[in-house]
Amino acid sequence: CGNPIQLSLFQGIPVDDLAFAGENAHKARGIQEQKRDAGVFSAVDVGLNVKDGCELYVPPSIRHEIGADALAMMYKSGFLEQKENCLVTDYGTNAEMALKIGDEIYTGSAAAGPAMEGQSIKCGMLAGPGAISDLEYDFKWVCKVLDDDIIPKDGDKVDFGLEIIEENGPMHGKAKGITGTGVIAAVAAAMDDHLWKKGKLKTSDGKLHLQDGVYIDSHDIAEALKAIGAMRAGHFTLLEHAGIKFSELDIMYMAGASGTYVDAVKARQVGLLPPSCNTIYQYGNTSLAMATDILKDPELLDELQDIANGIRANHIMFAGDKIFEQIYMQELAVCDEGMSMEMYNKNNAMVGIQELPKPKGTPTVHRMVQRDIPDLGERGMYILHDIGTELRGYMDGCIGCKKCEQECPEHALTVADGNEIVVKTKNCLGTACYRCQFSCPKKVYKYDNLKLTF
């Protein structure tokens, strides 16, 4: 239950029609639009190593970039049944979003980047044991650190203004990095403590020290604000295309892992959801939830196809949209140059774009699930710490400086005897940050040259 590109590559369907929007663009390039309807296929025929007769269920896309994952987001959250104006967003790297105004649905994808998942952040990591996932205010800021069961527990209590650890917590000494939700909390804390001014952290060393050597700096906050800015510009653009004001939008649905675990109040404060939204619903991994529903009841595919056919969607390609371009330029000026929100609104008003209001009051937050995967089944969850595979290889020209090892945020990489590169595949599959490759001073490290070993 993935996005159109994922499912198309998986099924062997050409993806060139996804690169361009509109019939004219396709016609000019001789591109044929592909059908991505629901279907039941042979799992063996698509290359899966399973027994003959095993069936593969593929849910439908709606159109263009609006894939099965976006349909799941709308279907499982209750978004489609909502009578009031409402917005739903999957808070991940691609930030799929949809705005419902009556029977009309406006969709887009903001390509927020990896900061939402803890990547491109110096101490960033994916959610796992030892990750700082939140900061909770209790007169000082308490770091929330994920334990071995991925449950947030109290870490150290920090005074960012005085730049001291006020008190050690039960998770002292166990923090290894910070997740995307932790970064959002840190950005909110920096703003609350008036430490983020004109695009810089106003601390003695330009860093916000959390615990156990984990920190975020001005560059990290700027990266996070770019991701936040992309999402805010996306939401803003959908409202402008729909012709409604922020004051007419109150209901927000948050999906995805980050949408489940992030503090929704802090998220609204920093701009991850519209400031007018005072009724917030947090859901889990809606794609996995819908996939589970299909496995339990394969006939659901027919219902989902009917829903997909009936959605009147207006898809906005943000990459070529003038409204998005105008708003995102202001977002970049805010995070890179410290431009004031007054100037932000003034610049947008000059081209007829409505004002971005300030958040008012405390929103009502409905946490619909406690985990992004709410149903763990009869056997519960078990974290497999060794999956038995590694990536290994030698790089011609490697000088053994171990810079790649030092830069790996997941502690997945080691430089062994003879400068052999060893990567634990349980921690890294080479699809996220590429810090190892970028950090190589001789530019000889190539992740793709590593070979899988058992």
Q: Where in the sequence are the language-model features?
A:
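Phosphate/ATP-binding catalytic cores across multiple sugar-kinase/actin-like superfamilies
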Residues: A70-M73, A224-S247
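Short glycine/threonine-rich loop-to-helix capping motif typified by GTGT followed
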Residues: N3-P14, I244, G256-C277, I316-E331, ...
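Acidic, glycine/GT-rich loop-and beta-edge segments that sit at the periphery of enzyme/chaperone cores
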Residues: F41-D69, D293-G397, E407
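Glycine-rich phosphate-binding loop of actin/hexokinase-like ATP-binding domains
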Residues: L7, I13-R36, P60, A72, ...
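Gly/charged contiguous loops adjacent to phosphate- or pyrophosphate-bearing nucleotide/cofactor binding elements
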Residues: I178-A227
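Nucleotide/phosphate-binding catalytic cleft detector across ATP-hydrolyzing
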Residues: C1-L87, D103-E104, Y215-I228, L332, ...
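A glycine-rich phosphate-binding loop feature that marks nucleotide/adenosyl-phosphate handling sites
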Residues: C1-G2, Y91-T93, T203-H209, E248-S258, ...
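Iron-sulfur cluster-binding cysteine motifs and their immediate structural context
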Residues: K403-N419, C433-L452
